[in-house]
């Protein structure tokens, strides 16, 4: 059973937070590698960089550059070791699916574009399971017929 995570799931793997225990245990129990796309990795890296900037401007927000850089190094190490299955989606098809999801669900539920693209990527890749800690994205994935176990 293939699974596709969003950035909230990846962040829970690489930074100790409320959902980390659940994310790590689920990831360890998976029979196959998580599928990741360049879009997901870009969003994850961007999020880390943004949190480092927030911290630099106001130490009560975000997290320190040393922590962020450690997260980026750990991700790179995991990618090099094959912890994740790097996928190369057909972005035209992902965009077609995303447009369909947007038309069907956004007006009623208010989904963000990146969330729609991640669910569309998972559908395109044939993933049966979507891993997220974002309630609105969970609603979209479930409405799209995916299992969201967390």
Task: Tell where the protein language model's regions lie, with residue ranges.
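Histidine- and aromatic-rich ligand-binding microenvironments
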Residues: 5-6, 36, 110-113, 134, ...
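Alpha-helix N-cap/helix-start motif at coil-to-helix transitions, marked by capping-box chemistry
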Residues: 17, 38-42, 69, 88-92, ...
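Phosphate- and divalent-cation-binding pockets in alpha/beta enzyme and binding domains
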Residues: 22, 43, 97, 139-141
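Short secondary-structure junctions
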Residues: 34, 83-87, 148
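Helix-adjacent hinge/juxtasegments
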Residues: 54-84
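Active-site neighborhoods of divalent-metal-dependent phosphate/nucleic-acid chemistry enzymes
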Residues: 82-131, 135, 139
């Amino acid at each position: 059973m293939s699974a596709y995570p969003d950035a909230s799931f990846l962040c829970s793997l690489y930074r100790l937070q409320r959902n980390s225990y659940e994310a790590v245990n689920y990831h360890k129990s998976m029979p196959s590698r998580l599928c990741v796309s360049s879009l997901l990795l870009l969003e994850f890296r961007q999020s880390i960089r943004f949190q480092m900037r927030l911290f630099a401007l106001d130490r009560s927000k975000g997290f320190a550059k040393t922590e962020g850089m450690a997260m980026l190094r750990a991700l790179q190490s995991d990618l090099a070791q094959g912890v994740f299955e790097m996928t190369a989606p057909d972005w035209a098809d992902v965009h077609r699916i995303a447009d369909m999801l947007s038309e069907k669900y956004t007006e009623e539920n208010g989904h963000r574009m990146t969330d729609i693209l991640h669910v569309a990527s998972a559908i395109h890749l044939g993933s049966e399971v979507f891993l997220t800690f974002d309630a609105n994205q969970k609603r979209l994935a479930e409405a799209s017929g995916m299992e969201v176990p967390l």
